[in-house]
C-alpha cells in the first residue's frame, strides 16, 4: 500500500488535533480545570485566524451529573450548504468520574462561503455606471380640464 503523509502547516486550525489535545488535557489535569483548558484552546484557534469556532464538552465535568458545556467564538455555519466547509472532529477523554466527549468545529480563514459577498471599488464603479445609464426622468402628465 502507498501512504501519503502531509505536514499540518497550522496545527491550531486542525479540529482533530485540537480535540485530541483537549481530551489529553482533561485526562492529565482532571475535570475541574475544563473551563481553563477549553478557553485556552478557543483563544489559540481564534489567534490562528479562524473565522469561527465551537468547542462542546459533554459528560461528568464539574460534578457527578452529566452536562454539556459549549464554548464558541466568531461566525460558524451549522446548517446548509456552507456547513460543509466547517472542519469537525470528536475525541473522548477517560476521566475518573467517567467519559467526557469533546467536539470541536472550526471555520477556517480560507473557507469559501457562498453567502459571503465581497464589495470592492471596481464593483462599486460598475454599479454606479449601470445605475446612471438606466435613470430616466419622466415628466408628470398634465391633467386636461
Question: Residue ranges of each PLM-predicted region?
Answer:
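RNA-contacting regions in translation and RNA-metabolism proteins
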Residues: 1-145
Amino acid at each position: 500500500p502507498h501512504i501519503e503523509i502531509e505536514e499540518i502547516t497550522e496545527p491550531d486550525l486542525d479540529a482533530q488535533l485540537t480535540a485530541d489535545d483537549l481530551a489529553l488535557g482533561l485526562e492529565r489535569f482532571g475535570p475541574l480545570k475544563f473551563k481553563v483548558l477549553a478557553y485556552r484552546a478557543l483563544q489559540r484557534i481564534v489567534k490562528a485566524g479562524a473565522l469561527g469556532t465551537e468547542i462542546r464538552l459533554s459528560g461528568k465535568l464539574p460534578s457527578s451529573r452529566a452536562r454539556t458545556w459549549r464554548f464558541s467564538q466568531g461566525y460558524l455555519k451549522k446548517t446548509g450548504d456552507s456547513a460543509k466547509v466547517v472542519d469537525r472532529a470528536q475525541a473522548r477523554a477517560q476521566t475518573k468520574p467517567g467519559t467526557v466527549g469533546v467536539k470541536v468545529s472550526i471555520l477556517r480563514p480560507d473557507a469559501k462561503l457562498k453567502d459571503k459577498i465581497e464589495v470592492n471599488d471596481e464593483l462599486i464603479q460598475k454599479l454606479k455606471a449601470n445605475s446612471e445609464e438606466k435613470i430616466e426622468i419622466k415628466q408628470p402628465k398634465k391633467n386636461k380640464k
